[in-house]
């Protein structure tokens, strides 16, 4: 359940701007501000079922965008590769004695840190 929650918020980070204003508002209230469906219903003066339907449409839209574009998957794969490269750099730094090579490695590590803080 928590993984679904995190995945939905990650999808929202990438594709949230593609949702309608109402879907975005309801999604943010539910996922980001931790309102219940009933609370959202009262605040927006719509039925609980209406809130549920709008939230479900938003979730379906986000999943559809990911299915078609795959940006989240690509991002996650890139982050894994960056971590692997950082581990390799660390091992090389521990074994390398040449100062020039160490400087190059330090520069590479710094650039990777900028990509993945």
UniProtKB/Swiss-Prot annotation:
SUPFAM superfamilies: Sigma3 and sigma4 domains of RNA polymerase sigma factors. Coiled coil: none annotated. Pfam families: UPF0122. InterPro entries: RNA_pol_sigma_r3/r4-like, UPF0122, UPF0122_fam_protein, WH-like_DNA-bd_sf. It comes from the Bacteria. Signal peptide: none annotated. Might take part in the signal recognition particle (SRP) pathway. This is inferred from the conservation of its genetic proximity to ftsY/ffh. May be a regulatory protein. PANTHER family: UPF0122 PROTEIN CBO2450/CLC_2298 (PTHR40083), UPF0122 PROTEIN YLXM (PTHR40083:SF1). Belongs to the UPF0122 family. This is UPF0122 protein TTE1463.
């Amino acid at each position: 359940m928590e993984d679904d929650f995190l995945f939905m918020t990650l999808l929202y980070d990438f594709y949230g701007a593609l949702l309608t204003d109402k879907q975005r508002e309801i999604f943010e209230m539910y996922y980001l501000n931790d309102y219940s469906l009933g609370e959202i219903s009262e605040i927006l003066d719509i039925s609980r079922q209406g809130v549920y339907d709008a939230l479900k449409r938003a979730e379906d839209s986000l999943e559809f965008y990911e299915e078609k574009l795959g940006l989240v998957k690509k991002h996650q794969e890139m982050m894994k590769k960056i971590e692997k490269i950082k581990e390799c750099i660390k091992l090389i730094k521990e074994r390398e004695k040449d100062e020039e090579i160490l400087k190059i490695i330090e520069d590479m590590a710094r650039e990777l840190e900028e990509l993945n803080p």
